[in-house]
Amino acid sequence: MSTLAQPPTYDATTTADTQLTPYLQLSHLLSLTWLAYPILSLIFVAFRLQLSMTSLENSILSVKSDILSSCKAAEHAATAAASMPRYMALATNEQFADAVNGSLHAARVALVVSLTAMEAIINFIIDTYRSTFFCFLELVVTGGLAVLISAVQGINTVLQSVTGSLRTSIQSDIASANSVIQNAINAINKVNPFGNINAPQIAVPSLDALQNVTLPASFQDALTSLNASIPTVADLKGALESIIDTPFELLKTDINDTFTGLSFNSSILPVPEQNRLSFCNDVDLSVIDEIGRDFIKIAKIGVVIIILLALLLIGFNCLLTWYKWRCMKRHLEYTRQAWNTDPTMIHTKTSSSSPPQVILTDHNLMILHANSAHPLITRIMNQLSARLRFSPSHHTNLRWFLHYIFHAPALACFLIGFFGLLSVEIQLLAMGPIVHKFEDSAAAAVSDFSNVIAASINDSMFNQSALYANDINSRVDVIQSTINNGVFGWVNSTTFTLNATINAFYTDIQKAVSTVFNGTVLESPANDFIKCFIGGKVDAIENALTFLHDNLQIDIPRVNDSILVLSPASVHEATAPIAAAAIGGGPNDKEGLIGRLVKAYTATLKKERVMFGLFLALWGIVVLMGVCILIWNTYGQALLKKRRRRRYELEQRSGINGIVVPFRSGVESENEKGAVLDLPSFTPLPSPRRSAFKPFWGSRSNSPMGNQPSGSAESFAIQKEEWDDFPPKPIESTVKKPSRLMAIGRKAMGKERVKADGGEESTSSSSEKSPSDEGIRSTTWVGKFTTLWTKKEPVPQSSEFWDQPSRGRPKLQINVHRDSADAGPNLYSSHTMQSRWSASPDATQTSWGKVMSPSKKTSTTTTATFQTPFGYSTRKSGVPIHDLDQSYDSLSSKSGAPASLPLPLYHGFSGSQSRPSARAEATTTERKDTSPPPPFAPYRTNKLPNPPYDEQRRTSTLRVMNPTFKSSDHTVAMPASRLLTTMDARHSSAINPFITPFDDEHRVTIDNNPVYVRQSIPTNPFGVAL
């Protein structure tokens, strides 16, 4: 092992010209208090919060920029939506032109067909009336003329017959008269004598005129000529049809000519211009600013709180550093007083200025270093152990576990992770109310933005639609005027023509009637009849033509000004996605840019939570490693040792040469064969077979120096099979008979009771509990709590062959220069007194009393003495330091006394050796002790004094260090139990296995001595915070 570099040496006369010291003083430590791990972790968390705040500000600016960019995109989208009239007009113009052209063509065809139908209807009506009238007129006129002609002819015939008969009658009457006259004359003549008288003759007129008497031939000729001159129906029908059809044909020709020139071309229809909207200047971004301001406010509040907390921690750390410095100074004083008052510390000088000559082992220095490095853990564990009455193994394991998990780097990971997670979780919890607060604001902003976009789109659409409607209506007016003036222009002339035609027709009929009945009695009735029959119809036709003249005009519907304007529902449907894309998104308008802002900050916090969680996970790994190490050292190694022991026992079941040695009566045995066979002392044992777990070369058990315990309380506890075995209970060597020396087992020693005079009384009750067990479970809650930390102590088993000490065969030392009275205990190695400031046991040596077994069983406990320099006062070994008053009353200067029990040499041989009990053997095996031969004791003329009464035993968790002795003629008497460094619980004293010289219970008070004057402080010098 390489030696460390030694510090430089200087001349004693060399003086240092600096006021600094090789170590840090209080002012220097106070200047470094701001570098404590909690403060550094808080500073780290504050920097993370500051970075998160900066990231949040950048996110807010990015979100606002994204909103403006989205708004520009929304403007383009809204422009496209507002330009829908243009695209609608492009398609509407084509459809409108096709509709207008189709309408004009249909109107032309309808008009032509209507005129044709009207013409046919009029002709039919006129023909109906004409046919009826002419048929009736022909009947009346022709019949009347025929009657008149027949009447004239009859009258002429009557007149001719009357006039002919009248002429004949006249002529016959005249002829008769002439005849009568003639006769008469003849008769007269006859009588007359006168002669004949000549009868006068009346001349008979010819009366031919009467024979030709007729009506005037002109009247008959007039009637005959009238009857011959009445026109026929076919001629009148053709004339009327030609009169009626002429305007209609002209109208049809005019309509066709007019509609041929009318055509609605879509290329000449107006198209609205594309209107660009601009509404981003009206976007309200106050919601983003407010939510960002609230988030930043939370981060700033967190930073301020962390800074204030760090400042408070700096102040507390300054106080803590001052307190630690004060406790350290007191601790140094405690250490000096502990060394000066410890009876095992043999000093050569009485002055307090001279340092005591003490051997500081590595283990003790490590204990001091651990206590000074983690004073808070030490203080807490001492108080917990005192309150909960932990066993030594529990105390050691838990203290080691706390040292392990709160190692400086692990503690830094824990603090960074804890404070970081705390800050992240607080921010995440604070984000919920903030987000809920701005949900309504975001929804209102989206609604307002939608209204702004809708209003802009509506204004643009109204303007474009009005311009488009005006242009379309002007073109419709031109077409309408063209149709009304061109197509229906005939109404102005045709109505007059029709009226003139009908009036002419009516006039002709009247003329015809007048002509026919001119001067006759039928003229007036015929005129009345014609007026009644035809006049009303003619008047009706004139009224119809007048109505057509007044109402026959085309009125084409005009285009409404809002023809290209969408309904409010359609505008909202078109603008809502645009507004949602600009400000809010998702089904509820909560996942837009505002939602993305919240999600981005939340994602940043979650990433930080993962980072801080990794720090805590690293600390958790350390905790898990510590738990695994505890489990291995507590259970794993014990199980492995048991497994190896069982394997070895199976190999040694057959004994030596097949000879099985029976058990001794009264001696406990753990298995059938026993851990150690009852053989003579120097009987050679068979060599064990080579095992994969143990080598044949030297180990701790077979090394010349014996079993040396490890340098720490942890490694010493590992050597024990159970937790409750640390510190080990005392092994007392009691001489029962002069011929035998039987070691009392560990459990038997645990049952000892101390009488009033300091003697021991062993109990035989196996069920009696030790005082420590009774104290541990004195209360219910403490018993329940400690049950979790303790386990049932198994029956100790024998160790392996490699670790078994040769306690049954003591290594003898024969001194040929001195008598047997001086061959006492090894004062330098095996029976040094126990130091009360050491924290763990040193190498355990078997008492020389076990080597030199007395033959009488009823003898008292063997004691050993050694000397101290003259002038040094020693205290009673059984009195603990906390029992000292303000003066060293219990310390007394004693001179040497002759040994009360000289032991002969032959007691060490096998013939008189008493075999120790199996329980004691197992206990010794567990400690891995050896019994090296006692070294030569220094020559003394005085004998060992009688041991003082053990008035009050002092227990210690530490073993004795080897002090440095100077030549002196004085010795200090110590009991054997004190030399064996046991920790058995005595009924006469309260046991605290965790007491050290630096605890409050062991504070030392010195009276009236300026060298040792100090105040007794009721605090633990190492019980301070980290």
UniProtKB/Swiss-Prot annotation:
UniProt biased composition (Low complexity): 854-870
Protein's UniProt keywords contain Isomerase: no
Cellular localization per UniProt: Cell membrane
Membrane topology, Cytoplasmic segments: 48-108, 322-403, 633-1026
GO CC, alphabetical: mating projection tip; plasma membrane
InterPro entries in the cross-refs: PRM1 (IPR026777)
Listed transmembrane segments: 27-47, 109-129, 301-321, 404-424, 612-632
Superkingdom in the source lineage: Eukaryota
Keywords: Cell membrane, Conjugation, Glycoprotein, Membrane, Transmembrane, Transmembrane helix
Polar residues bias locations: 699-713, 827-848
Chief site of localization: membrane
Keyword Ubl conjugation set for record: no
Glycosylation sites: 212, 227, 256, 265, 458, 463, 492, 499, 518, 560
GO biological process: plasma membrane fusion involved in cytogamy
Biased composition (Basic and acidic residues): 749-758
Extracellular membrane side: 1-26, 130-300, 425-611
Topology of the protein relative to the lipid bilayer: Multi-pass membrane protein
Disordered, as annotated region: 693-777, 793-812, 818-879, 904-952
Protein family: Belongs to the PRM1 family.
Described purpose of this protein according to its UniProt entry: Involved in cell fusion during mating by stabilizing the plasma membrane fusion event.
Protein name according to UniProt: Plasma membrane fusion protein PRM1
Annotated source species: Laccaria bicolor (strain S238N-H82 / ATCC MYA-4686) (Bicoloured deceiver)
Gene label: PRM1
